[in-house]
Amino acid sequence: GKTQLAKVIASAFDRDFFRIQCYEGITFEQIVGEWNYQKQLLHLEAAKNESDNEEKIFHEEFFIRRPLLNAFLNEKDSVLLIDEIDKADEEVESFLLQALGEKEITINDLGTFQLANDLIVILTSNSQRSLLDETKDRCLFLYIPYPSVEREIEIVKSRLPGAEDETVSKIVKIVHEIRNLNLMKKPSVRGTVDWVRSVSSLGTKNFNKSLEDSIGVAIKTESDKKRVLKDIIHKKY
């Protein structure tokens, strides 16, 4: 899928790979970095008789870097994947846009850091919300549709070479039927792979039971699960 594309680009161009996995409520500290307060307090306690000890705690040795700062300061050319940016709020998106546009990050009490390599940035979105126009204007848009049945079978087999052909084929076809339903979250290719792996582990002798018992690896909400069981699994299998 989209994540794999970013990894392949990094590998093909011999670049280091960094990833920011966005989610609802993600903060600047989780993207850029944060002060190690415990280490700062320990240093203050150990050096409480020194007059300038407070200034010393605002150095890089007391700062925990997160993916964005690591990608910026990496000496080797890199690829940064900002995965599912639509899950982050607009404030975080604006910050990322500014940092990447200006090629620098400013951290209070620590200073400004310049981009140190030729960084390729890849954003992925599942359209949970519309991205800012400024973000769209600065990106090359690429839509990646779900693969065909035949292609998805090939992908699953490449990930799970030990899986039975019949199991792979059945589950991939079921997933394609599921994607035609109006669901809150349709199963991803990763979900298909996980479902095949789970059914194979549970055993294919009672395929229908294994399929239903492991449905949660591909279907991620209770309402979607009920819909899939009612309209596809119980009706057709």
What are the language-model segments listed below?
Residues 1-237:
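C-terminal regulatory/interaction module of P-loop NTP-utilizing enzymes
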